[in-house]
């Protein structure tokens, strides 16, 4: 991240505008690198950083104004969905049998499990 910040900087006229990470650990690393470059210290000079998992440490960074947001995935909802799919196959059915109560994308084997955003208390 530090090398990216030196290549894409205000001085070079091509600044990083947004950082989206696959998890909060990566987002926290990005925040740390940004802080080393004078951004996201809580003083308003901020590059938005988003993560996934809604960890306590990420929520704290968000509440301090150092990180922008995170997504909390529904682990129980995902587990329940998987159990339903496994049960269908175990009982001799099709993988997507008994999914009428789920949010299923038509034409593909994909089920959407709701999530929640967190952008501060």
What is the predicted function of each stretch?
Residues 77-121:
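Hinge/cleft segment of the Venus flytrap/periplasmic-binding protein
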Residues 64-76:
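Short beta-strand elements at the ligand-binding edges of bilobed clamshell
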Residues 1-59:
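Hydrophobic alpha-helical
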Residues 24, 73-76, 80:
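Electropositive phosphate-/nucleotide-binding environments in soluble metabolic enzymes
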Residues 53, 74, 121:
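Residues at the C-termini of beta-strands that transition into short coil/loop
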Residues 33-36, 64-65, 85:
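Short, glycine/charged-enriched secondary-structure capping and boundary segments
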């Amino acid at each position: 991240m530090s090398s990216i910040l030196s290549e894409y900087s205000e001085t070079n006229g091509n600044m990083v505008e947004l950082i989206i990470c696959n998890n909060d650990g990566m987002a926290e690393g990005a925040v740390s690198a940004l802080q080393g470059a004078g951004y996201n210290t809580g003083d308003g000079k901020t590059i938005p950083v988003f993560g996934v998992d809604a960890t306590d440490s990420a929520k704290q960074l968000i509440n301090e104004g150092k990180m922008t947001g995170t997504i909390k995935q529904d682990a129980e909802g995902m587990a329940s969905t998987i159990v339903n799919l496994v049960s269908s196959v175990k009982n001799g059915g099709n993988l997507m049998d008994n999914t009428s109560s789920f949010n299923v994308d038509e034409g593909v084997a994909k089920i959407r499990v709701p999530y929640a955003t967190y952008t501060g208390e």
